[in-house]
Amino acid sequence: MSTKAELACVYASLILVDDDVAVTGEKINTILKAANVEVEPYWPGLFAKALEGINVKDLITNIGSGVGAAPAGGAAPAAAAAAPAAESKKEEKKKEEESDQSDDDMGFGLFD
């Protein structure tokens, strides 16, 4: 039951955030009653308290970027670390191309 209650409260919270309405326990409970979903009385208040002071829209937007709520200073080292990774990918592609050529030289082609 608690998994369904948690999910229902999450959806109700997302509905409120999408409509730019403050997330409170009463409003979550109102949406749950309108949807005919029964949850234990402490769930709506718990979710409202957990989301208090959090900008949920920014959180959802940043999930795709992989940064999350990291401070702005933390982004520079991540970008610097990405450069060597890109170089290693280029090296892997070169090695892969070389290995493809070596297979051709051996005469084991599919249609030879």
Swiss-Prot record:
Gene Ontology BP, a term: translational elongation
Modified positions (Phosphoserine) in chain numbering: 99, 102
Region described as Disordered: spans on this chain: 80-112
The UniProt record lists the keyword Lipid biosynthesis: no
Cellular-component GO terms for this entry: cytosolic large ribosomal subunit; cytosolic ribosome
Biased composition (Basic and acidic residues): 87-97
One MF term in the entry's GO annotations: structural constituent of ribosome
Taxonomic superkingdom: Eukaryota
Oligomeric form and interacting partners: P1 and P2 exist as dimers at the large ribosomal subunit.
Protein family per UniProt: Belongs to the eukaryotic ribosomal protein P1/P2 family.
Function: Plays an important role in the elongation step of protein synthesis.
Protein name: Large ribosomal subunit protein P1
Gene: RpLP1
